Amino acid sequence: MAHILNGCSFYKGLYIARHDRLVDLVSQELRQVQDRTTHMYKHSTVKLNWFDHNCTDNNILCNIPNTPDIVFINQARKSLTIFEIGCAFDLYLDTCFTSKFMKYQPLVECITALGYNCQLIILVFGSLGHVHKVVLRGLQMGGLQKADAKRVQKFCSVSATIGSLHIWKRRCVVYP
């Protein structure tokens, strides 16, 4: 089942659609609680010209993963928050969290070196509906009140499950 819901290259487009739906849900909710001076980028490569800096090394962001799911940047406060969202088979939530953390930690270090306060928030949802233990706290760190964070967490969990149901139904059509 893990292979069908998360690992088969035949269903990659459906995995991406499920993931992008989660990104859209989270970004929509978080955007509402950010102040007007905060810019949001979705599925965008982090660029050096986003920052006020004195760095002369134009290749500082090269050779590291630098396309997170959601980025909020506030120039006035010199702060940046990166949201990375994952949808893994429920047994591998911790593995997915660690993988995402290790992937984007070099980007956080580069942005911090530019003089910005950078936060990395990882939200991992299970393809069968489980939610990683830090998702609620991550949504709150993004600015949501606890009740709203719980609502978004549950909505994303249900959305991931529905996405998995679509994948399973497609599998049953292809291999009856």
Where are these regions (language model features)?
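Short Cys/His-based metal-binding microdomains
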Residues: 1-30, 80
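Short beta-strand-loop-alpha-helix junction that forms the active-site gateway
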Residues: 67, 79-99, 125-127
